[in-house]
Amino acid sequence: MKHIIILGDGMADHAIDRLGGKTPLQYADTPYMNFLAKQGKTGMLNTIPDGFLPGSEVANTAILGYDLNKVYEGRGPLEAASIGYEMQPNDMAIRCNIIELANGRIKNHHGGHLTTEEGDLLIKFLDKELGNDQVKFITGIQYRHLLVIKNGNKHITCAPPHDHPNEEWKPLLVKPEEGYTEYNSDRITPQATADLLNDLIIKSQSLLANHPFNRQRTEKANSIWPWSGGYRPSMSTLMQRYPEIKSGSVISAVDLIRGIGHYAGLDIIKVPGATGLANTNYEGKASAAIEALKKQDFVFLHIEASDEAGHDGDLDLKLQTIRYLDARIVKPVYEAVSEWEEPVCIALLPDHPTPVEIRTHVKEPVPFAIWHRGIQPDKVTTYDEKSCTRGEYGLLSLQQFMETFMKIK
């Protein structure tokens, strides 16, 4: 049996008055998601371990069956792997957003949804102006880039910008980790690391404000914002962990997810036109997943758009991304693999909720559905946050999902 996970990032949500007390998943027209729930088995999943913030790097790593307490090193190292940057032993890699500040506050976490070409222009400019033997700016995707600090210390506290929309930015500057007292002579101190990053933030603002790109633009990409740093992780591959998987692929527009896939031993498939937004190439991603499954045992198909809509607080857009996921991802994948001689097991789930009224991730269980041709359905008939609480799988946590999924034969 082959296995595919279809993950709608941030797709889960809360009940919304405008939708008559329904969640976006309950309200949107999703016949194929509902089919998987009705003809399959469902449940709820805790994706965030105790002591961790509800980030996509945490949730997606847990969904794939890893113990975060053993492998977690933050987003930076994962994104470094995705873009082909070979981390050295004393490197600290940290995510570097390009964001928009206005009136002393974080207006958005994405600088007005930069294209990758626009982000590359600004990151190369910043590396020329601020980079040196200790500091290197590296282009990623869109507004999501990488900052590498030689001998940097990961024991710092950073504020993910998507968690703090409309908040004053100065109180959110980098701080040394409270209570951390160990000394490593190979690295600068947490305080020195925080000071260095804050200095780069301040200097980036004057440089970006005066860049011709921002002078001709209504939305401003006018500050960097580093967060989620760490060292090179040590992870076993999925093939080493699950004998059912001989080979597999990850399909995502997001460096973070590609980086997880890299360390998990998956091939990284890059789909032209995959943007991570509502305008992504859904058909191309579905087709790539189907073709990969013809040759391999496992595919992790990640769709980012609903998470971005949640962060923007855009309910109409979130509803649209959910409908698109149903009609342009779930439908073609199901219709293709359901006809194959070799059975394929499909799992559908988000990694975490990103409620539009909160505009950030929350640590709550998410609904999942698992279908294959011979499965005995439970009594759930629709796919959403409420219905799946009645599912036969009950409430699973962390690695239990992958263990359950891979045992299905």
What are these regions (language model features)?
Residues 1-409:
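Feature captures the catalytic ectodomains and active-site-proximal regions of enzymes
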